């Protein structure tokens, strides 16, 4: 019998500070110790997407979708990297 799979998504407020990221990492680590397989999805930290969009629109009134997608994905990648670092403890 296969182990259950749990998918958890943490929004910007949930990963908005280092303390919150540590809390999320602790939750994930505790659940993982039970043997459950997990998929974790994180958003950019609270307010980061808006900041990035504002920067883009300062430079271009009609930014290309490709560049916007790449720019905005950096917020999620930062959150994912910080969470991965927190999970190493």
Model-derived features: where do they sit?
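Nucleotide/pyrophosphate-binding catalytic subdomain
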Residues: 1-89
């Amino acid at each position: 019998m296969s182990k259950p799979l749990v998918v958890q998504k943490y929004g910007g407020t949930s990963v908005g500070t280092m303390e919150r990221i540590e809390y999320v990492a602790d939750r994930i680590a505790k659940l993982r110790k039970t043997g459950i397989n997990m998929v974790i999805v994180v958003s950019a930290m609270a307010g980061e997407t808006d900041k990035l969009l504002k920067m883009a629109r300062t430079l271009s009134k009609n930014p290309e979708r490709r560049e916007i997608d790449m720019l905005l994905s950096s917020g999620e990648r930062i959150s994912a990297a910080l969470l991965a670092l927190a999970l190493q403890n």
